[in-house]
Amino acid sequence: EFQTPEAVMVYSGDGLNGMSQAFHQLYRTRLARGYWRDRERPILINNWEATYMDFDEEKILSIADKARELGIELFVLDDGWFGKRDDDTTSLGDWYPNLHKLPDGITGLAGKIRDMGMKFGLWFEPEMVSRDSCLYRAHPDWMLGSTDRPVCTGRHQYVLDFSKDQVVEYIGDRMEEILGDGGVSYVKWDMNRSISDLFSAGRDARYQGTVYHRQILGVYKLYERLTRDFPHVLFESCASGGARFD
């Protein structure tokens, strides 16, 4: 079974600006949905430019305390909180807290941020995997690309094969473990590279021509699962490398 891509079209007699505004209106009133659609977003601070991946709980709480004084409503912990990630060569896919940096885990840190009167947000890059990761070592066939030739990298990372249900389910399970304690109010969903090497290991030649579309359907499946199970969490897409707006 294969579902072809959907297209969204509008008409305007007022040129490109009118067409752009018609698209905005259509998406905001008919296609966007959920708890956050018409609500004002909280004012947030993100630690990325302040620390990159060089942080521990003490440093994060120090930034959060200053943010609290400024009236910031949401603190977002960016890349580097999971696996053994101290740089961008490792640990994507290993979505469990780095207890060396955060000895009380995400739950403990989130509680301390909330005690300051702010909500807590967290960075994920769900569609990606590092070659130096427990996930890749356990499932090298879960990466997009042929197993008998080199696969292109971007930012030292690879793309997971979201055309496979078991991959989507696994990543969903790991994310739900983190989100399930109720401490995370916001998710920054990143995607820092383009999709290439469109080959799904173990599939026949006919299937390969549908991989790109099935990949995005897999992303949508994960969107649907998480927004259904966590309707009050604000999910924000950040895809400087992926060039998407979904």
Residue spans for each PLM region:
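Aromatic-lined carbohydrate-binding/catalytic grooves of carbohydrate-active enzymes
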Residues: W36-G172, Y186
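Short Pro-Gly-centered flexible turn/kink motifs
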Residues: E1-G13
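Pocket-edge structural micro-motifs
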Residues: A7, N47, D181
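A generic structural signal for short, non-catalytic loop/turn and secondary-structure boundary residues
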Residues: F2, W36-D38, R228
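Acidic/polar, glycine-enriched structural segments that form the non-catalytic walls/loops
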Residues: Y11-R39, M53
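Generic detector of well-ordered alpha-helical packing
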Residues: A7, L77-G80, W189-M191, S237
